[in-house]
């Protein structure tokens, strides 16, 4: 070994109060170097990376030093964890992107730490054996060290409030749909049917209320269903107004709403649910993040593409596909100005549902371009606005 290696050994031995004579220095290998480094009492100053498994009240920590040796294994309560990181020198902390993780990321960042959020499915392969808090914390610590690891962007409190609005609206719409189906099902038991569409429910309830052949108990129960349906509709309207208020206050959302098939609601959801669009290298990467690109089953040099991956946010993907389907219906009936040669050619070769997904992919790419460039949507010369 060279002189510089021996000098390092002597310095480490002196720093850790370990006596190393000449014969030992000559026999010392890299493993012994690690052993010397870790003799003595480990301190938080040696920690370069911490993985933390979070829960409601118990937090498991796993920290390593510069030579990847575990020097911290602790289980702390909520209060103890906060105090620990307040006193710990700035380091890198890995958290699983789950409930409450964005709150902890903001808090720990305020203490000077660099926080990385890792998706659960990306941390899972690093769990060696069994499922417990210590193994999860170690897996997070190991996963964070990978140079190609992908991380979840930390959300601000305002972003989470906006997503709460979106989630609440989605839940109310789902409840209204379930209630409408229940009303239709119960009405059919008494021989009363209605045409498709949410707009037909009020007329159905009026017919039921005016039908003298129904038992009094059934009339009362249908009245309760009707009251609940109207309350849900009122709550959804209130949330839509809040969503539109946020849309009108944001210039980027206004630009996105100009894209055919997107609209104000779709633009607001795109802006709220999308992290920093500059994270994506291209519009294709953004569409892949939403789950609008085909699965790759290629092998032996043969390219085989299947159905779309359906990765990413389901609601965001649904909004784009529904918007594309609506735009496609207008094109097929001749009521749209956006019938490009590309779109008409695709309609001749492929099924309408497949074309709608392809169009949704193109809408996602256009949205990414507007979000990253700051430009307004404009129609190209001689082309449709969606081409």
UniProtKB/Swiss-Prot annotation:
GO biological process terms, semicolon-separated:
DNA transposition
Q: Name one GO molecular function term.
A: transposase activity
The record's annotation in InterPro entries points to: Transp_IS110-like_N (IPR002525), Transpos_IS110 (IPR047650), Transposase_20 (IPR003346)
Q: Does the keyword Transmembrane helix apply?
A: no
Alphabetically ordered keywords of this record: DNA recombination, DNA-binding, Plasmid, Transposable element, Transposition
Xref: PANTHER family: PUTATIVE TRANSPOSASE FOR IS117-RELATED, TRANSPOSASE FOR INSERTION SEQUENCE ELEMENT IS1111A
In the record, the note on similarity to other proteins reads: Belongs to the transposase 20 family.
Check the record and name the NCBIfam families matching this protein. transpos_IS110
Q: What is this protein called?
A: Putative transposase y4pF/y4sB
Report the source organism. Answer: Sinorhizobium fredii (strain NBRC 101917 / NGR234)
């Amino acid at each position: 070994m060279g002189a510089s290696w021996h000098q390092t050994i002597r310095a480490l031995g002196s720093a850790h109060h370990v006596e190393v004579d000449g014969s030992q220095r000559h026999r010392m290998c890299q493993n012994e170097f690690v052993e010397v480094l870790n003799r003595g009492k480990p301190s938080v100053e040696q920690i370069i990376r911490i993985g933390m498994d979070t829960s409601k009240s118990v937090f498991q920590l796993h920290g390593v030093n510069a030579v990847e040796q575990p020097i911290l294994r602790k289980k702390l309560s909520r209060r103890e964890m906060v105090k620990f990181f307040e006193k710990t020198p700035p380091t890198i902390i890995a958290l699983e992107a789950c409930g409450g993780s964005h709150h902890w990321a903001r808090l720990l960042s305020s203490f000077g730490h660099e926080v990385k959020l890792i998706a659960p499915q990306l941390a899972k392969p690093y769990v060696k054996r069994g499922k417990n808090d210590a193994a999860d914390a170690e897996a997070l610590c190991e996963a964070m060290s990978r140079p190609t690891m992908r991380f979840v962007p930390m959300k601000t409190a305002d972003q989470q409030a906006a997503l709460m609005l979106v989630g609440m609206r989605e839940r109310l719409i789902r409840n209204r749909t379930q209630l409408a189906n229940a009303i239709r099902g119960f009405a059919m038991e008494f021989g009363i049917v209605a045409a498709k569409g949410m707009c037909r429910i009020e007329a159905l309830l009026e017919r039921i209320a005016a039908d003298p052949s129904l038992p009094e108990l059934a009339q009362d129960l249908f009245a309760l269903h009707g009251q609940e349906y109207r309350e849900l509709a009122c709550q959804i309207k209130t949330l839509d107004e809040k969503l539109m208020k946020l849309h009108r206050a944001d210039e980027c959302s206004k630009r996105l709403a100009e894209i055919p098939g997107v609209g104000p609601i779709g633009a607001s959801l795109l802006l709220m649910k999308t992290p920093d669009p500059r994270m994506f290298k291209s519009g294709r990467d953004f569409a892949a993040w939403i789950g609008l690109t085909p699965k790759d089953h290629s092998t032996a040099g043969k390219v085989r593409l299947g159905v779309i991956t359906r990765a990413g946010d389901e609601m965001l993907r649904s909004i784009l596909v529904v918007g594309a389907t609506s735009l496609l219906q207008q094109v097929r009936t001749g009521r749209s100005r956006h019938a490009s040669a590309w779109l008409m050619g695709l309609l001749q070769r492929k099924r309408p549902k497949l074309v709608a997904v392809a169009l949704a992919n193109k809408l996602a790419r256009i949205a990414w371009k507007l979000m990253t460039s700051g430009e307004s949507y404009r129609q190209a010369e001689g082309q449709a606005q969606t081409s």
